[in-house]
Amino acid sequence: MMLILSILSIIAFAAASPVPSIDENIRVLEHRAVTVTTQDLSNFRFYLQHADAAYCNFNTAVGKPVHCGAGNCPDVEKDSAIVVGSVVGTKTGIGAYVATDNARKEIVVSVRGSINVRNWITNFNFGQKTCDLVAGCGVHTGFLEAWEEVAANIKAAVSAAKTANPTFKFVVTGHSLGGAVATVAAAYLRKDGFPFDLYTYGSPRVGNDFFANFVTQQTGAEYRVTHGDDPVPRLPPIVFGYRHTSPEYWLDGGPLDKDYTVSEIKVCDGIANVMCNGGTIGLDILAHITYFQSMATCAPIAIPWKRDMSDEELDKKLTQYSEMDQEFVKQMT
């Protein structure tokens, strides 16, 4: 009860404060001038394979090909993508690889998602840390510290790859919490002069409105893909001062094995939109670990789920957060 009262206090405070970024950024673009193309959909599927491959290639030796023993990255393997850098953070546990793909002429950074995502959801640890990207910037403490631990290694690998392949484009990707750290990585790598395109799948919100607007406006495209009622992109809550990058590409539910067409992908714009995934409720872990295919199937261990809170209790808590966010946004428009 005390937690709910605290959240209501946050909502009351926010409602009395000017929040221009919400008024300016809540709109749904189901019929955008630039719609989802077949190439976009193809890219969603391809970079998802890189995001999935990070679960079992985060410590692959330099010079070795990206390989997924579970058959979950066949197109990446077909292109013979070669690892040019890999790193595991000893403090935060974050893992990532940098690979070059001569067939597509690109340098790819792929960040591993956490195998303890339910643990993260249950802890409700949503503190922010000041970042130096832009004035007023705040980023989730855990995501920023994870990036800071591996930043030097990734930047060195990217710089070397660029020197060897000066015409290659740049892509950074990640699933789940890996998508969050990939978003932070994109922001800093872009600021350092590498125009990365960003593909994330089931990423949580990463920072405040200053951060979200900064990343959205940087050189380099954002493709933030969400699926059905995946609970992770709804966290941390809007009422806690978090915002998403824009736009969002929503795989609007259906069977887990659904073969989506471009017309079935809904595009929602705005850093605080609740028109796509943000308008859903509940705890649907299967929606989170299924993006075109089952995720983390090549991980060395199965995804464990913390049980300090029952699924029923967690479902109720997530539903409360979502409903509060929707009401908050409604009051701001």
Curated annotation (Swiss-Prot):
Residues 1-16 form the signal peptide. Optimum temperature is 37 degrees Celsius. SUPFAM superfamilies: alpha/beta-Hydrolases (SSF53474). Induction: Shows a low basal expression, but is highly inducible by lipase substrates such as olive oil, and repressed by glucose. During plant infection, transcripts are detected 4, 8, and 10 days after infection. It is found in: Secreted. Disulfide bonds join C56-C268, C276-C298. Gene3D superfamilies: alpha/beta hydrolase. It comes from the Eukaryota. It catalyses: a monoacylglycerol + H2O = glycerol + a fatty acid + H(+); a diacylglycerol + H2O = a monoacylglycerol + a fatty acid + H(+). One of its GO terms (molecular function) is metal ion binding. It holds the Pfam family Lipase_3. Keywords: Disulfide bond, Hydrolase, Lipid degradation, Lipid metabolism, Metal-binding, Secreted, Signal, Virulence. The keyword Magnesium does not apply. InterPro entries: AB_hydrolase_fold, Fungal_lipase-type, Sec_MonoDiacylglyc_Lipase. Its EC number is 3.1.1.-. GO terms for cellular component: extracellular region. Optimum pH is 8.0. Secreted mono- and diacylglycerol lipase that allows the use of hydrolyzed lipids as carbon source and might play a role in pathogenicity. Shows lipolytic activity towards olive oil and p-nitrophenylpalmitate. Belongs to the AB hydrolase superfamily. Lipase family. Class 3 subfamily. This is Secreted mono- and diacylglycerol lipase 1. The gene is NHL1.
